[in-house]
């Protein structure tokens, strides 16, 4: 009969989607990171807002709930979003760009396997990229620090681009 958990949206639309400033910012980020649609950007923005909200709640919470801080900081450090010496106050400074930089699509592009984020997206969706020995077909996969060195490309075009970059 299905899962008994409550299904929630994984993104939040902007309050004023047709505001000029919001449109310019979303178009800039979507173009730079090669996102397919605005929903991908909203999903990453929702993640950043979620962790900022948790940080605000923990700052206001009594000392007896300080044990909740450590796992959240460790998770974001493993993803490479926070530095090793991060504190709870650093959670308040999270931005969408920090999450977009940790997507598999962006990392494949930055490593030089692809000439553009759009080419990186195509390589991933066609199954030419492996992370830690597993084929991953989601461009939005958030890459952990320990997995970053284990990204490999199985397509000959990756090798050509890699030679051009070096």
Swiss-Prot record:
It holds the Pfam family S4. GO terms for cellular component: small ribosomal subunit. GO terms for molecular function: rRNA binding; structural constituent of ribosome. InterPro entries: Ribosomal_uS4, Ribosomal_uS4_arc, Ribosomal_uS4_euk/arc, Ribosomal_uS4_N, S4_RNA-bd, S4_RNA-bd_sf. SMART domains: Ribosomal_S4, S4. Residues 102-164 form the S4 RNA-binding domain. The keyword Ribosomal protein applies. One of the primary rRNA binding proteins, it binds directly to 16S rRNA where it nucleates assembly of the body of the 30S subunit. This is Small ribosomal subunit protein uS4. It comes from Korarchaeum cryptofilum (strain OPF8).
